[in-house]
Amino acid sequence: MIIPAIDLIEGQVVRLYQGDYKQKTTFDLSPLSQLKSYQDQGASWLHIVDLTGAKDPDKRQTNLIADLVDGLDANIQVGGGIRSEAQVIELLDIGVKRVVIGSLAVKETALVQSWFEKYGAEAICLALDVNIDEQGEKIVAVSGWQSGGGKTLESLVEAFKPYGLKHALVTDISRDGTLQGANTQLYREIASSYPQIKWQASGGIASLDDVAAVRDSGANGIIIGKALLIENFNVEQAITCWPNS
């Protein structure tokens, strides 16, 4: 499944290079028009990252996200520094279909497990952003990739499996924003180890060949941001390559 994505800072569509706010590209685009275009080309899910909220929880772009949800028919998945149950409730209340939880799942695992029990596994996607070390260990990073969480991807999956974990978004940090292609080996490994989880791949997608490679890796979906913004290909072409199921 193709999941087009936009990142937002203070209402503007941006892309960061490897999560670095200092390496930001701003696009002169209306968030709603851009997402509508993706939807009109056939996307049934859209991914929004609130980078302002990720940096400062007091400045979450909830009103903008509510307007985007209201203006779109596609299902919306939202991430970016979600740190409290109140924020989860707020997003679900405005019509967001799935919230993406990253650092908190590492730092406060029991708290996030309780959200799975309250809101159901369909409403939560774990974001597992990994640095792969020399031994091949998949170490999950936290706090906008500024620090290592010390937990492996597998240990977190095992912690959430009893709570019905269904959706997980995995980014190889070294590929993010680079347009160097996805780490398909990573997705092959996790999809074969945990076939019951719907894996979303993210990071490095530059071409339709990359989309096809991720499709063939066993991942269930692919988050595409920068490649669509710089028009390497469009959503319609991507869906032709990997039809939504």
UniProtKB/Swiss-Prot annotation:
Assigned EC number: 5.3.1.16
Pathway: Amino-acid biosynthesis; L-histidine biosynthesis; L-histidine from 5-phospho-alpha-D-ribose 1-diphosphate: step 4/9
Cell location: Cytoplasm
Signal peptide bounds: none
Record-level Gene Ontology MF annotations: 1-(5-phosphoribosyl)-5-[(5-phosphoribosylamino)methylideneamino]imidazole-4-carboxamide isomerase activity
Active site: 7, 129
Record flagged with keyword Membrane: no
One annotated GO biological process: L-tryptophan biosynthetic process
Principal place of residence: cytoplasm
Alphabetic keyword roster: Amino-acid biosynthesis, Cytoplasm, Histidine biosynthesis, Isomerase
Superkingdom of the source species: Bacteria
Disulfide cross-links: none
A cellular component annotation (GO) from this entry: cytoplasm
Catalysed reactions listed for this entry: 1-(5-phospho-beta-D-ribosyl)-5-[(5-phospho-beta-D-ribosylamino)methylideneamino]imidazole-4-carboxamide = 5-[(5-phospho-1-deoxy-D-ribulos-1-ylimino)methylamino]-1-(5-phospho-beta-D-ribosyl)imidazole-4-carboxamide
Pfam family, one: His_biosynth
InterPro entries registered for this protein in UniProt: Aldolase_TIM (IPR013785), His_biosynth (IPR006062), HisA_bact_arch (IPR006063), Isoase_HisA-like (IPR044524), Isoase_HisA-like_bact (IPR023016), RibuloseP-bd_barrel (IPR011060)
Alphabetical list of CDD domains matching this protein: HisA
Family: Belongs to the HisA/HisF family.
HAMAP family according to UniProt: HisA (MF_01014)
Name of the protein this chain belongs to: 1-(5-phosphoribosyl)-5-[(5-phosphoribosylamino)methylideneamino] imidazole-4-carboxamide isomerase
Lineage, broadest ranks: Bacteria, Pseudomonadati, Pseudomonadota, Gammaproteobacteria, Alteromonadales
Gene giving rise to this polypeptide: hisA
